């Protein structure tokens, strides 16, 4: 998967990009760890209220759903291996998974702006 640098307000991160059906379906499944300030960015062709789950994912994660303007719509904490879904509250073009608590530690949430997002 391609790797890019993103800016979430003042925080620099490195993100693997999942931009096709295969990479989006696999996501962070089976990963045992994430390096500090690393995550996975899911890129979609169309904006929609996408939902995610944690099947086969041993890491606790927080997901940020992001609109086409690069603004965080909402966050959701996701527990390892949980099969319940976490959905965007409004149409999203992107979703960013980071280690659980990363956004809270950096005081980021709904309305926070991302820079460096790729075009779908």
Model regions and ranges:
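Compact, glycine-rich, soluble single-domain proteins
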Residues: 1-120
């Amino acid at each position: 998967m391609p790797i890019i640098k993103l800016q979430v307000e003042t925080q620099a991160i490195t993100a693997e990009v999942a931009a096709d059906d295969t990479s989006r379906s696999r996501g962070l499944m089976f990963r045992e760890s994430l390096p500090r300030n690393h995550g996975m960015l899911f890129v979609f062709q169309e904006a929609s209220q996408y939902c995610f789950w944690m099947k086969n994912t041993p890491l606790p994660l927080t997901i940020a759903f992001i609109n086409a303007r690069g603004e965080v719509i909402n966050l959701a904490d996701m527990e390892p291996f949980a099969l319940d879904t976490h959905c965007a509250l409004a149409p999203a073009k992107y979703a960013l998974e980071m280690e659980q608590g990363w956004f809270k530690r950096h005081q980021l949430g709904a309305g926070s702006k991302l820079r460096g997002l790729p075009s779908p």
